[in-house]
C-alpha cells in the first residue's frame, strides 16, 4: 500500500500548492524513492481541454494524450516520473464514471449518493494512480471551505481513517500575511483555515506557511500551539528569488525528514543528492549572457496560458548560463502594423493557439522573422502560420490559408486531419462535426528527421518523440509545391503521412524552424530541450553579430 501525502490549501488560492508538493517530491526522489504525483480538481469539466486559456491557463498534455491541469507540468518539471491520464482527476470525470456505472447497473439498483459512491470512486482513482510507488503526493485543487472540494476532502479523510498515519499524511499550505501598517505577520488566517479543516475531520500533520518573508520561530510556535501541529512541522515558505530553489529551501527545514519519520521509510532512503538543483539555481543567479525573446501569442494577457513555453525558454537559457528575457506581444496588435515592436529582439517564438483571431498577426510575424533573418521558432499554430506565410509570399500561392480560418481558401495549405494512426497503432478519424473535447491528435508521437537538416543537427538523432495537441495539419497536396519553392520538410510521422516539422535552408536563414508538436511539454530545468536550447543559442549568436565569443554551460 503506497504511503500518500495529501496537500490542501487554505485562506486564498494561488499560493503554490503544486510547486510546494513538486518540490517535496523532488527531494524524496533525490533520496532514492520512487515518487509519483496526482491532482484532484474540483471543477465539473471532464478535463481542461475545452476551457478558455484566459480563465484556466495552459492545457498540459501527457504522453498518453490526456489534457490536464497545468500543475501536472510543474510536477513533471520537478520529478522524473512521466505522468498520465490517471494522474489528473476532476469532479466531472468522477461523476461521469459513477453515472456510467449506474447506467450499466453496477450498483444493483442502489440509490447513488455522494457518500459512498462518489467518495469510493475518488478513492479508486487514487489507488489506481499511486500503485507501485514508494510515496505519492496528491494535491487537492481549490481552497478549504469551497463547497466543490468537499467530496474530495471527505474521501481523503476516509483514507486516513482506514490506513492510519503511517500510510497517509495531511499537509496544509496556508497564508501568513504581512501587514505593513502593523509591521508584523498575522497568524489568525492560518488558525481559522486549520479550524475549518478540522471541522470536517482532517487534522494537518504539516503546515506550510506562505508569506512574503520568513516566519520567525516565535510565530511558528504560536501557530503550532493553536493548530495542534508539532512546531517542527510548521514550515516557513517565504517568497524566493528562484522558484527552482524551493527543493533546497524545504530540504534545509527538514520537510523530507518529517515524511520519512512518519512513514517509517528510514531503511529505504539514502542521503539527499540535490546537486542538480544547486546547479540550476547557480545558473539562474550567475548568468554569463542575456537575450530577449518575443513571444507572439493570442492569450498573452494571461501568461499562464503559455506556462510551459515560458519555462522551456528559461530552461534553454539555463543550459548555457543565459538569462532569457521575455517580451509578450499580442498577435492581433501586430496585424497591419510596421512590426516596430519586433525591432531589437534576439529571437521570435510563435506558440500554439486556436481560431482566426490574431492568426494574420502570426503570419506577419513569420514573414518579418524570415525576411529580417531573426531566429524563429514556431510551435503548433506557429508552424501553421509559417507555412501559410511561405505559401503566400514565396511559393506564390495567393490567399493561402488554413481551413480553420477560411474554408473557401483557394490554397488550403493547412487542413483538418481526418485520419491518423495513434501511438498504439489504432486509426482515429475526425470530421468538422466531431466534438471539441478530446478529439484532437493528442499525446506522444514518434517522427523521423531528415538527414542534414537543422532539426537533425539540433536533436542529434534520427527518430524523436514529441507530444501533440492539434486538430489541423500540413496539407499533403502542397508538399511538393512548397518543397520546390525552398521549404524544407525536416520531420515526418513514421508512416510518412503527416508533416511534423519544417525549416528554412541555413544558406537563406540562420535559424528558422517550426514544429507541429509541443516540445515545451518535455522540457525540464535540469535537462532543457534540444529545440529550446538550440533556439536560445541562435538568439545569442544573433545578438553577438553571428559569432559567440564565449560558450557557456550550466
UniProtKB/Swiss-Prot annotation:
GO terms for molecular function: ATP binding; CTP synthase activity; glutaminase activity; identical protein binding; metal ion binding. It is an enzyme of class 6 (ligase). It catalyses: UTP + L-glutamine + ATP + H2O = CTP + L-glutamate + ADP + phosphate + 2 H(+); L-glutamine + H2O = L-glutamate + NH4(+); UTP + NH4(+) + ATP = CTP + ADP + phosphate + 2 H(+). It holds the Pfam family CTP_synth_N. ATP binds at residues 14-19, 71. Residues 1-265 are annotated as: Amidoligase domain. The keyword Calcium does not apply. One of its GO terms (biological process) is 'de novo' CTP biosynthetic process. Homotetramer. CTPSs have evolved a hybrid strategy for distinguishing between UTP and CTP. The overlapping regions of the product feedback inhibitory and substrate sites recognize a common feature in both compounds, the triphosphate moiety. To differentiate isosteric substrate and product pyrimidine rings, an additional pocket far from the expected kinase/ligase catalytic site, specifically recognizes the cytosine and ribose portions of the product inhibitor. Belongs to the CTP synthase family. This is CTP synthase.
Amino acid at each position: 500500500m503506497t504511503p500518500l501525502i495529501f496537500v490542501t490549501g487554505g485562506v486564498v488560492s494561488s499560493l503554490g500548492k503544486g510547486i510546494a508538493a513538486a518540490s517535496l517530491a523532488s527531494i524524496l526522489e533525490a533520496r532514492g524513492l520512487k515518487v509519483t504525483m496526482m491532482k484532484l480538481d474540483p471543477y465539473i469539466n471532464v478535463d481542461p481541454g475545452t476551457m478558455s486559456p484566459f480563465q484556466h491557463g495552459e492545457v498540459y498534455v501527457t504522453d498518453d494524450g490526456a489534457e490536464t491541469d497545468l500543475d501536472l507540468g510543474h510536477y513533471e518539471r520537478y520529478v522524473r516520473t512521466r505522468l498520465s491520464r490517471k494522474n489528473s482527476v476532476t469532479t466531472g470525470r468522477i461523476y461521469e464514471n459513477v453515472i456510467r456505472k449506474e447506467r450499466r447497473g453496477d450498483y444493483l439498483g442502489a440509490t447513488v449518493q455522494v457518500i459512498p459512491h462518489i467518495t469510493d470512486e475518488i478513492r479508486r482513482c487514487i489507488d489506481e494512480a499511486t500503485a507501485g510507488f514508494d510515496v505519492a503526493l496528491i494535491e487537492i485543487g481549490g481552497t478549504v471551505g469551497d463547497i466543490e472540494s468537499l467530496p474530495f476532502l471527505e474521501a481523503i479523510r476516509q483514507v486516513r481513517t482506514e490506513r492510519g498515519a503511517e500510510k497517509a499524511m495531511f499537509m496544509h499550505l496556508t497564508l501568513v500575511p504581512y501587514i505593513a501598517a502593523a509591521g508584523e505577520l498575522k497568524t489568525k488566517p492560518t488558525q481559522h483555515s486549520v479550524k475549518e479543516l478540522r471541522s470536517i475531520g482532517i487534522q494537518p500533520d504539516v503546515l506550510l506557511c506562505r508569506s512574503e518573508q520568513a516566519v520567525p520561530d516565535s510565530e511558528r510556535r504560536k501557530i503550532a500551539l493553536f493548530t495542534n501541529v508539532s512546531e517542527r512541522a510548521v514550515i516557513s515558505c517565504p517568497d524566493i528569488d528562484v522558484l527552482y530553489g524551493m527543493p533546497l529551501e524545504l530540504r534545509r527545514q527538514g520537510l523530507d525528514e518529517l515524511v520519512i519519520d512518519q512513514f517509517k521509510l528510514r531503511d529505504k532512503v539514502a542521503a539527499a543528492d540535490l546537486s542538480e538543483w544547486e546547479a540550476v539555481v547557480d545558473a539562474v543567479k550567475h548568468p554569463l549572457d542575456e537575450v530577449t525573446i518575443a513571444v507572439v501569442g493570442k492569450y498573452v494577457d494571461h501568461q499562464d496560458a503559455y506556462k510551459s513555453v515560458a519555462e522551456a525558454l528559461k530552461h534553454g537559457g539555463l543550459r548555457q548560463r543565459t538569462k532569457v528575457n521575455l517580451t509578450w506581444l499580442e498577435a492581433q496588435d501586430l496585424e497591419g502594423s510596421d512590426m516596430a515592436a519586433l525591432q531589437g529582439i534576439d529571437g521570435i517564438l510563435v506558440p500554439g493557439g486556436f481560431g482566426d483571431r490574431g492568426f494574420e498577426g502570426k503570419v506577419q510575424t513569420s514573414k518579418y522573422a524570415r525576411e529580417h533573418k531573426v531566429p524563429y521558432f514556431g510551435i503548433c499554430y506557429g508552424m501553421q502560420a509559417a507555412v501559410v506565410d511561405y505559401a503566400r509570399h514565396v511559393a506564390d500561392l495567393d490567399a493561402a490559408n488554413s481551413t480553420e480560418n477560411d474554408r473557401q481558401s483557394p490554397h488550403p495549405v493547412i487542413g483538418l486531419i481526418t485520419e491518423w494512426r495513434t501511438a498504439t497503432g489504432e486509426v482515429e478519424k475526425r470530421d468538422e462535426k466531431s466534438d471539441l473535447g478530446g478529439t484532437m491528435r493528442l499525446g506522444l508521437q514518434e517522427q523521423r528527421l531528415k538527414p542534414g537538416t537543422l532539426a537533425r543537427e539540433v536533436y542529434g538523432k534520427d527518430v524523436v518523440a514529441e507530444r501533440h495537441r492539434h486538430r489541423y495539419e500540413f496539407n499533403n497536396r502542397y508538399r511538393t509545391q512548397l518543397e520546390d519553392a525552398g521549404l524544407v520538410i525536416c520531420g515526418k510521422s513514421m508512416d510518412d503521412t503527416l508533416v511534423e516539422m519544417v525549416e528554412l535552408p541555413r544558406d537563406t536563414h540562420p535559424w528558422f524552424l517550426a514544429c507541429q508538436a509541443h516540445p515545451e511539454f518535455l522540457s525540464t530545468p535540469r535537462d532543457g530541450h534540444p529545440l529550446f536550447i538550440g533556439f536560445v543559442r541562435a538568439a545569442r549568436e544573433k545578438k553577438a553579430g553571428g559569432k559567440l565569443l564565449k560558450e557557456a554551460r550550466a
